[in-house]
Amino acid sequence: MIIFNLRFKHNSMMRFFLLLIFLFPVITFAQPDRWQQRVKYTMNIDMDVNTNQFKGKQKLEYTNNSPDVLNKLFYHLYFNAFQPNSSMDVRSQELGKNFINGRGDWDARVRDRISKLTDKEIGYQKIISLKINGVPQPFKYHETILEVNLVKPIAPKSKVVIDMDFEAQVPLQVRRSGRDNPTTGVRYSMSQWYPKLCEYDYEGWHPTPYIAREFYGVWGDYDVTINIDKTYKLGGTGMLINANEIGWGYDAPNTELKPITKEKRTWHFVGNNVHDFVWAADPDYKHLVRKMPNGGPTLNVIYNYIENNPKNDSAWNEVADAAVIALPYMESKFGKYPYPQYSFIHGGDGGMEYPMATLISGPGLGTVFHEWMHSWYQMMLGTNESLYPWMDEGFTSYAEDLVSKFYNKKSSLQGLKETLQRNPNNKNLADLIPILPEDHSSAYAGYYALVKSGYEEPLTTHSDHYNTNFAYSNAAYAKGEVFMEQLGYIIGADTRDKVLLEYYNEWHFKHPNSSDFIQVAEKVSGIKLDWYKEYFCSTTKTVNYGIDSLWEEVGVTKIRLRRIGQMPMPIDLQLTFKDGSTEMHYMPLNLMFGEKPNENAAQKREVHEEWRWTHPTYVVEVKHKLTDITAVEIDPSKRMTDVDRKNNLLELKW
């Protein structure tokens, strides 16, 4: 009997195994019956570009589809965050006192900038009057939240009309919204610019104070009229209704802004079935238009024109061309884009998503693909980002990686390898590459860094209440993306792709939560997955498996595997033989009550008895002589988030 004990001797050599992902037709199920509140905004604002202030009138038709009597309303007043000593200001400065990896843990765009804003640079939103069905209502400010105590409650299944007059001042650009961005040069990036009704759902009201994190809105229709200096050019959510009066590429390609005698021009946008409205304005904007074939959406690219800079023009034209190429792939993987237009607008402070539009600070295609994919994972699905930021940023980052691979014809791991070739002294990257999967490799690297840091918090943490920006960003973006790729390891990549399409079909425009997603995944896969959500999202327990020992008895090789970490998983175990052939041995987890299909039809696979989660070890028996085996490896695809892979591969030399 020959025994190899690997508890103290490990082989660090790794091999990569790329699993191909194919798209399968989607399975359909009954749509969930969950009530949704409904809004219809009609707004008219008058902007003064000299004072950066505007006055607005808002008519809001609010339908209470809930079974509840509403005694209060809550509104977001986001601009009020941009004042010294605001919650956003103090929160940013407090986080900046934490030093992680030698740097202050604050958003570099915010830092302590709010504390230094002058009276003319701050933002504010003030309510002048508020009436419901003609009756004045008392209201109270809570910084970025307006509380309205109703004179008469709103009955279930009823509709009210809310009329509001308000005034606002656009803050100097600090985060997302604002004026006079020093980086982009854009005059106005107008997100979170109007008093916005908070969402009321099956959990009640969500009056979340604004500290620069996430959003949650009510589905509805927006009719927005903007009166602004006639030299300004605009882009935004929805369709421009008065395109014939405006020109500038909205009425026909390459047309100029139509001359008018009045000092202010009126722009009239309408966007239906959305939960927010964004716009941006600048006198130097240039407008590119692309039409998708076969009746698809119109694609707009609106950017700050720089005279005698053809490189800038070329980069923004590539954005337009890339969007045309990418959209069919995006729809095939994630569902149909249902709106009549989408606009990539130069503005903001990085990249920020909105219905039918995004504000991006530059023409980088990674940001372009990421923000556009937010049209699926937030704009069409509308999860509560504050509670489930990983379903927003994580799912979007997952999709971005695939779209980038499709467009660039290279995987994320290939990109990291090219980076290492350019920077051969980057030891950290050199150590990482062997343990990362072919796709979503940067996300896995981010997750492993989070685990190693000791700052990790559960994904169930409210986005505003993470103790560090470092933990929040790596959880929402990296771990959320890893959640989806690792799901493919558990149920099979092809099945996971079906899940994503069914998730879209079943839940778009319905505000799903994490349990809703898991339920869809269980229906499509036939596998129980509540354990996966609870372990990976509700705890910080980690996956760690190893090859403990192997030996031969009467021509049968036995391999003892050991679960070292606290999170159980199904196991793929690949054997490599002297002739170069391979064989997969699969141990489903007993909590799954099922098994994933063979992901590689060209490779022989044997399904073994399920591994009970209570048992730390498992002995695999294979009908091969030990001396015929040259390598044994746990999860050669490296999609399982094993935090210590040095004991996952054993190479045998005979």
Feature roles, as predicted:
Residues 87-100, 167-222, 638-654:
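Glycine/proline-rich low-complexity spacer/linker segments in large multi-domain proteins
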Residues 15, 38-39, 77, 269, ...:
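Hydrophobic alpha-helical and helix-loop surface patches within well-folded domains
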Residues 63, 103-185, 610-627, 637-638:
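A surface-exposed beta-strand-loop module
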Residues 58-60, 77, 158-172, 222-230, ...:
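Short, hydrophobic/aromatic-enriched beta-strand segments in well-ordered soluble domains
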Residues 240-243, 373, 462, 494, ...:
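Non-catalytic accessory/interaction domains
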Residues 29-55, 529-531:
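N-terminal, polar/Ser/Thr-rich
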Residues 74-135, 231-232, 576-589:
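Solvent-exposed beta-hairpin/edge-strand motifs
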Residues 197-204, 212-369, 398-401, 410:
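Hydrophobic helix-coil surface modules that form long, contiguous segments used
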